[in-house]
Amino acid sequence: HAACLDMVYGDYDVIRFYGKHAMERNLERTHLGHGTLSFGSRRGTSSHQYNPAVILAQRDTTENAGDCYGMLFVYSGNFSCEAEKDQINQTRLLMGLSDELFSYPLAAGETFTVPEVIMSYSADGFSQLSHQYHTCISEHVCRSRFAHEVRPVLINSWEAAYFDFTGDTIVDLAKEAASLGIDMVVMDDGWFGKRDDDNSSLGDWFVNEKKLGGTLSELIDRVHAQGVKFGIWIEPEMVNEDSNLYREHPDWAIQIPGKLPVRSRNQLILDFSRKEVRDNIFDQICAVFDQGKIDYVKWDMNRSMADVYAGNLAYDYVLGVYDFMERLVTRY
């Protein structure tokens, strides 16, 4: 585990945050009786099913009064959180990597560094704890120039049109957005390959100019001419079996050797623990981004990891995603 907090006395509640699609981070407060309360993720992501955060609070703690201790795990993959009250009423709180399906062999002299946990304490209730976390994250974790900027209000083409759009309908959406004071239009899934439904083309990151009725550069200029910013959707970690990429490199999808892969939303996950896989997708994405002034990127991930073929896969996969993101941020 990355963090361990021992309390020699006290009677505590555990607060964690569960969720599902379109209903993330619901607060659940439970009295910690004798035994162990645990939650986490085995999905390959930190997940909105169970958020990698926990609060240990005195039973009478409120928004504005009382003791509370927070832990935030600064990591995007599998995790485990445990709270235990033992037979002599001591309490222990643990947060870190999940050890289920996890092993990481080290050669002589090699080291392994676990991700960090941000811990915070408040004697003045949950609001103060929240403010402390806000300050810490904005000052010391967020490093982009946007850390202290007001976020733009955006409208997304997905709920407006799903896959059924053209360049003209995106521009019409931009005109309507401008009239309502909306700052940005995001062109969602469906702009690439032969992507008119969710059965094909993930992994083939080239602009479908026939669908857009012109080049991406022309569309971006038309949207900007309406006085709004332009954003674009990507799902770089995923691949459809009906794609040029999969036909050329079926071994790039995560699967257990000798077994059929598990599909979800008609897609498989690319093995981002492998540099050659990341490099290919990075080059494709950059060839798109270089075509015009893109203001915003929506990075999607629409399925969880199932075919874990090795104990180090999930961890190395997350590091691969971080490497990919770092390269994008550095380049743009």
Model-derived features: where do they sit?
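Short acidic, Pro/Gly- and aromatic-enriched capping/linker segments at domain boundaries
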Residues: 87-107
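Short Pro-Gly-centered flexible turn/kink motifs
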Residues: 104-123
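Polysaccharide-binding surfaces and accessory modules of carbohydrate-active proteins
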Residues: 1-84, 100
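Glycine-rich, aromatic-flanked loop segments that form ligand/cofactor-binding clefts
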Residues: 52, 57-79, 121-145, 153, ...
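Active-site neighborhood of glycoside hydrolase catalytic domains
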Residues: 208-226, 246-332
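Core alpha/beta catalytic barrel or barrel-like domain that forms the active/cofactor pocket
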Residues: 147-152, 183-194, 233-236, 292-303
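Glycine- and charge-enriched low-complexity intrinsically disordered segments
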Residues: 146-162
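Aromatic- and glycine-enriched glycan-recognition loops and surfaces
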Residues: 157, 161-247, 253-254, 279-280, ...
